[in-house]
Amino acid sequence: MRLRKNLTNALIYALLFTLAVIWLVPLFFLIVHSFRAEPGAAIRYLFPKEYTAGNYIRLFTDTELFNFPRWYMNTLVVSLASCALSTLYVLMISYAFSRLRFRFRESMMRAGLVLNMFPGFMAMIAVYFILKAVGLTQSLLALVLVYSGSAALSYYVAKGFFDTIPRALDEAAYIDGASKSTIFWRITLPLSKPIVVYTVLMSFMAPWMDFIFASVIMKDNYDNYTVALGLFQMITRENIYDYFTVFCAGAVVVAIPIALLFLFMQKYYVEGVTGGAVKG
């Protein structure tokens, strides 16, 4: 029995190790080749023959063709604005579904779950024509509206977390004269740090990494490109030989904020996911 258990554990660890290697190899390749001095993408060796930090310098200084610093700031502005709006929408709607009882509540929750099962790009053409009708295409505001507009459909994890907070706290606050708004801002949210962090991370990541919606909305407006669109231009057929290593450097720079956020907030992220995984 013990031998069988040890063998099972060994197989599980071997599988996890293999998956970890498969996941880390592309990341290792990306980081190493961001320091490669030789140009080109089609190479037959893993380790560069010569190392240089010039790719990172070129990324931020050679802005005539690829204005990475501007694209980076565009992405940061869009991500922060979308994150703030999306977090507010998700938490307030989740709290309403968790604590309030009103007509069509169950129907609205089911409709939200069903709609959230469909990928967002299915509505891409309709969204584009709506934005075009109001003159918002090729603008950063359009991206903020698109990313934050559908955020509330992801209410279910936050609602599950709010369901775990005892209602007795709300009732005690009602007796003391607190309003629903006061309870939400001063009692519920301070007790919900894990789900707030989880919502912030999810709301920030989506616009930071998105390519599809940004490419449809921005078209050829290079000045308002996000980093996803800008980096893609570096690996087109006519640019990939000269800019592939710069692309690798840009990909590393783009990954740093997300990596740091998860590194310092992973505790709250896990608590938010597990705390919200209850039946509401």
Task: Set out the residue ranges of the language-model regions.
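A hydrophobic, multi-pass inner-membrane permease signature
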Residues: M1-G280
